[in-house]
Amino acid sequence: MAGYNLEAIEAAPLKDDLDIVIPTIRSLDFLEQWRPFLHHYHLIIVQDGDPSIKIRVPEGYDYELYNRNDINRILGPRANCISYKDGGCRCFGFMVSKKKYIYTIDDDCFVAKDPSGKDINVIAQHIKNLETPSTPHYFNTLYDPFRDGTDFVRGYPFSLREGVQTAISHGLWLNIPDYDAPTQLVKPRERNTRYVDAVMTIPKRVLYPMCGMNLAFNRELVGPAMYFGLMGEGQPISRYDDMWAGWAAKVVCDHLGFGVKTGLPYLWHSKASNPFVNLKKEHKGLHWQEDMVPFFQNLRLSKESDTAAKCYMEISNMTKEKLTKVDPYFEKLADAMVVWIEAWEELNPPVKKKQSDGKDVKAK
């Protein structure tokens, strides 16, 4: 697409602008296979579970490693907003990062190959997705018009062809599908072998089930909305952390005028989790999602919510107002959402800019 040098975007690793966040409870030997693509980048590793267990990181990586003791030390009483024994702990890494972009990956994911047999560079594709516009207001039947070899089709309004800034790039996976427990039980041997060479913008006012295992986003645009909820040990629900963040962040993107892409890149998901354990973690969520999804579908934010943080505070208020009748847990979740924003703003104070008279004002 004219005006966007896709080769330059792919060639530029943006290593000074992107952090890789990895939640883990085990050895990070999987990083050996990722070395050709990830070794240039700074890693933020969030160790879940027992902080006395030593996590081994392969040599040569530049990283910070945080365990639960570190989270408690840094956040103090606000640490209770970070999930324990749940992949949602990764959002602590989003909070302490200072980079423009975040890429988060699970520790059971490996490099996949495209149909030609070439290793897939997930970072390059995510950066390409994030650095080119989204088209949420009108669907292009050739999918992403900013990819090489495609464009806007006949009938696409010229007034909408500029697109909007992309905030989220949602990648996919080969091999083990990201299924809920009932589907896992019905299809225990099913594998995803279909490689679809496509990137598309999720239309405005349309939700999607966001998976955190292969995800990149613009932290400056939507970082405060990427809260993976209060789940795991001590909570009645788990395995909905990424979906909660995805629903909320999509509402924020729609309100603020940003876009969300899904599709390429693929990675290889190697390890199927136990469906019986998952069923115990998910069983309330499987019922509650019938209320959570309509809640987010019907959310409309006020014009006063002009930043991701303000949007998220408003969503917190509506969560308490609308979802507490489903279960008292949602009041606790809504309170944790407020604490999350307070902690975010403590570690990431709003940047001040100068007015014409030289006085400081908070940047929006």
Curated annotation (Swiss-Prot):
It is an enzyme of class 5 (isomerase). GO terms for biological process: cell wall organization; plant-type cell wall organization or biogenesis. Its main location: cytoplasm. It is found in: Cytoplasm, Cytosol; Golgi apparatus. The record marks R154, R161 as: Required for activity. Its cofactor is Mn(2+); Mg(2+). Belongs to the RGP family. The conserved DXD motif is involved in enzyme activity. This is Probable UDP-arabinopyranose mutase 4. It comes from Arabidopsis thaliana (Mouse-ear cress). The gene is RGP4.
